[in-house]
Amino acid sequence: MEELFNFFQKPKGPVKFNKVKISLASPEQIIDWSHGEVKKPETINYRTFKPERDGLFCAKVFGPVKDFECNCGKYKRMKHRGVVCEKCGVEVIQSKVRRERLGHISLAAPVAHIWFLKSLPSKIGAVLDMTLKQLEKVLYFENYAVTQSEVEELPLGTLLTEEKYRQALSEYPAQFKVGIGAEAIRELLAAQDLIGLSRVLREEMASTSSQTKRQKLGKRLFVIEAFRDSGNKPEWMILQVIPVLPPDLRPLVPLEGGRFATSDLNDLYRRVINRNNRLKRLLELDAPDIIIRNEKRMLQESVDVLFDNGRRGRVITGANKRPLKSLSDMLKGKQGRFRQNLLGKRVDYSGRSVIVVGPHLRLHQCGIPKKMALELFKPFIYNRLERKGLVTTIKSARKMVEKGAKEVWDVLEEVVTEYPVILNRAPTLHRLGMQAFEAVLIEGKAIRLHPLVCMAFNADFDGDQMAVHVPLSVEAQVEARVLMMSTNNILSPANGEPVIIPSQDIVLGLYYMTRERINVKGEGRVFSSVDEAIISYDYKETDLQAKVKVRRPEGIVDTTMGRIILGELVPKSVPFVEVNKVMSKKALAALIDYTYRHAGTKDTVILADRLKDTGYEYATRAGISICIDDMKIPATKVGLVKKGEDEVLDVEQQYSDGLITAGEKYNKVIDIWSKVSEDVANEMMDEIKTETFEDKDGNLVEGPSFNSIFVMADSGARGSRDQIRQLAGMRGLMAKPSGAIIETPIKANFREGLDVLEYFISTHGARKGLADTALKTANSGYLTRRLVDVAQEATIVEADCQTLDGIVAEPLLDGGEVLVPLGDRILGRVALEDVVDPFTGEVLVVAGEQMEEDKVAILEEAGIDRVMIRSVLTCRSKRGVCAACYGRDLGRGHLINQGEAVGVIAAQSIGEPGTQLTMRTFHIGGTASRSVEQAEIRTHRGGKVAFNNLHYVENSSGVKIVMNRNAEIFVKDEFGRDREKFKVNYGAQVLVKEGEDIERDTVLADWDAYTIPIVAEVGGIIRYGDIFNGITMQEKVDPVTGKSSMVIVHSAGGVTLNPRISVKNDRGKTLKLPDSEGFARYSLPVGSLISVEEGAEIKAGTIVGKIPRETSKTKDITGGLPRVAELFEVRKPKDPAIIARIDGKVSFGKELKGKRRVVVTPEYGEQQEYLVPKAKHIIVHEGDYVQAGEPLMEGTIVPNDILSVLGVKALAKFLVDEIQEVYRLQGVKINDKHIEVIVRQMLKRVHITRANDSKFMIGENVEWWKFEEERDRLLAEGKKPGAAEPLLLGVTKASLSTESFISAASFQETTKVLTNAAMSGRVDELLGLKENVIMGRLISAGTGINRVD
């Protein structure tokens, strides 16, 4: 009876746990888990389909095939629960135990576990101090290993070949023992004394001075201490028993025609059992040694393949030549257990369909087809039908729904009303890719989507599909409504700007209604009230675009009829000024932003919907369409193109006269055509921008044009200046697939049509665009995945970490132009110190205050240009960041809440545009857009010129030539404040005098954009040194012109030579340089051209050589994505630059073969030497003063150098600026703090340099806060703490070195991560997000933060 009651008990809840430990299994443990031994390779009987006894599917071991029914049929049904059948030995129980019961195979000979053998560095090898090759020789029966020895010449673990063994046996009979195969290795492992070994190794490490030796010992020590501390025994890496997976996890399914489909694992197990049984038989028969060895080796190989197919030897394939999936393959990769089933599951109560536009919907609604809703909400409908008493059982409810009775639809309406559903569009690149809406039932089969949320989803209606999910629990519904509702996601989490912005037709309509037209009905009328104006419009007395005056509360306003109508739509708190202008897309975005900040969410949502309706209405009324005559080709085009052709002929002539090189010719031609293309575009835009109207007095006036194409582009509805240029200007230069620009431009535009050659050239660009898109989408997705993985554990853990540290925020300048104003960089951040007005001394912002829009405006007004702000980079919170260091939650507009997953948001914000960037190339159709090289400095404001650190010589024509690198020109205002600051390149010509007053738009300096000059600082006679034709120099004769030029080349014979040009006096002595100790000797790097003849007499400031700059490639995002990935992965760039590690004066030391020696001498202390390859161009000069961190040569700076020279903050600033640069080129705005979060995660660990009394090892990498905790503990105890230096890890490395082994294993290199974790007996505390998702718990972020047990 009791049995029966047990059956009706509630099912047990899920197991509660808060940690997961992984370790090695001992043979006893495996047998303890097992429910019996699998002795035979048989699976099921092909006639009866019953499992064979003792086989791989044996019911006795794994449990019955049918619920409560033994194999022979003696016991059936519930009443015999728990009985073990005496005939067939099967326990009568539910068949689902076949999913959880393990079996085992007892091996006749031990085998090595391949993970611990082959996963580098080999764990078995580390314990025994043997190489992988040596181990394999023993394991695969080639060599003997000494397992016991009393002879000094034969220490334990010595390898002996067959003849060496015989020889040793005759020399030392009965004094040693050898073994072979896994048995020998097991014996050696069991004999290791881990505690003694680790002590010896630590002593060795302390005493050795060689870096490589220390690293080697450190690796070995790590493994040994892992075994010592985890309680795992090294001999467990050799298997004596193999567990067998439960049969329902490796099913065997009968197909029609008497065949079977089976899991590969069954084949693999079968091979192991066959070989094991054969080995047992051979051992019983006392077979010859050689046969037994062969069989043991085959057993070892079959177990290797079962665990990890293809790790050693060739991949074992099945009948259809497909590699068999081993146990490791089940875990690995995108299709493995982690990523396929644990991190990404399919969910019930979901559907997908095509989307169409729903212009009548409100912002919080979406249309769901009735048929779909009926299926999604079935259980709710059954419940409602029962409650209403329309049906009595679930079965009858189901029938009623299937019949489609009238009541069912009414019930469906009730269920769906105000029920939030979640819509998702793949690819979900950021959190706005999943939003909640209230469902509205519609006829038809397509989901209807509100047009304004398309931008967030990146959706359009050309056949996109979306998925619908139903949140079931009350909590899920609340979260969907409060957090995910589209009305609560007005701002983008990436940059805090609205994502719900009108686009396309809506913009066109609103733009059209707010434009003014000259001389239309009702112009000049004055209305006493808004109502009167609108009545006048309704009676068609006044035109929509008529200029009128109207009386409003703030006074009489000049406006137009359309703007009055629009003004009625905005909330009361938004002043009329905000809409009393032409509403382009930018203006509408600003209006929505203003409304959100001043009127709140609700009003913004209402406004957005009203704008949508009005926009559509007036776009329809406007009836804008385009025709071919709207594309006006400028009359001046022919002349401009002709002029371009003449200039190109001129350049060709210079080239054939040998005045310029092929590279210079190419660059000049490209520049000419870029310029012509621009000029034609400007002429064309001028032509369509304005048209002539007749005003009411009959005079002709110019006004903004109503040309349809111009209207579309100007409003921001569709099309760009570039596209119009191609339609009506000239198509311009195109790029080859390699990225190089083709010299011949396309002179025609699309209205005129392309000829065959032009068409052929354009196919290049177009095709490259499409190919790139496909490739780069994948790369961008991979970048996002790496970023999410590194940042997933960064959440907001506390309100304030009380740190006193922060970073400096400054506006971002480029050549005197403000690219990013200070306001953009500090908005929503928390001030670290009081911000004081430099003139009045008034405190504008108090320390610890969040800087909102109003404060930022005050700071910008006061002209403040640097503020100390809190930053996640300096946050002291452990395992996360604090709210004060993070600042504003950009997607919500207030200080961030605790528990917010800022890491994931940061990763999405950086990764999402990555894919957009990749898709950018494609719209302009591959026309080459390359900025004409900036070769001059122009002022943006007037003022007084001041030089800073500018050394120059005057050349023969009296122009100042800049002779040093960090020269700057300032423009100061009347108060003497610096208004603009420009860096001036070495070799530039300065065209103004110090102290001169200048107007705006004055050219201060210019230089050659294509070459870097080498300038003589003194006059005299030129002499060559080490310039030998055919060795260090080559005369290159141009095939076209027959002219020769001298180019310095790299050659094996000239390694020790240093090609140079010296300036000497008439007595043949090299002249000294004025104001420095050096001489007028100029080294020529490889690739430079010599510009002066030997023996020529020159004046100071003459160019003696030139180094050509790279021929320009088109600026495609290819520079972008790979560059971003390179920075985040901290890869060594292709041509790294050497940087100065100290401040000091530069001099050149004695040359080393092939390298030049740059010496930096500080005022006090040691001088430092740097060796630079001769082929590289050194950009510092004798006597220059350099600062630490400045590059000494051309090339890309290596992030790790910045970290070691200038520290963490400088590195972070470098990374943020470099990454932002790539995105800014593409016009993508990302807030700095997102990049800072990722950089913080990359800098999470420190590298132990001295261990002293701490528990760490030299060379170990640990979290900074663990190191600090240990340091504080040791100092408190009066002991000596270790020392550490900050460590910068690339995002992949950082993800793999995370605390959580579950998270790391699900990212990459699964087997390696699990092997290391098992060996160390790692415990996963389940603190991050990913590991909790995998374990099926609530994540420790957001609403789950207080719920985690």
Swiss-Prot record:
InterPro entries: DNA-dir_RpoC_beta_prime, DNA-dir_RpoC_beta_prime_bact, RNA_pol_asu, RNA_pol_N, RNA_pol_Rpb1_1, RNA_pol_Rpb1_3, RNA_pol_Rpb1_3_sf, RNA_pol_Rpb1_4. The keyword Lyase does not apply. Signal peptide: none annotated. GO terms for cellular component: DNA-directed RNA polymerase complex. It is an enzyme of class 2 (transferase). Its cofactor is Mg(2+); Zn(2+). Binds 1 Mg(2+) ion per subunit. It catalyses: RNA(n) + a ribonucleoside 5'-triphosphate = RNA(n+1) + diphosphate. The RNAP catalytic core consists of 2 alpha, 1 beta, 1 beta' and 1 omega subunit. When a sigma factor is associated with the core the holoenzyme is formed, which can initiate transcription. DNA-dependent RNA polymerase catalyzes the transcription of DNA into RNA using the four ribonucleoside triphosphates as substrates. Belongs to the RNA polymerase beta' chain family. This is DNA-directed RNA polymerase subunit beta'. It comes from Desulfotalea psychrophila (strain LSv54 / DSM 12343).
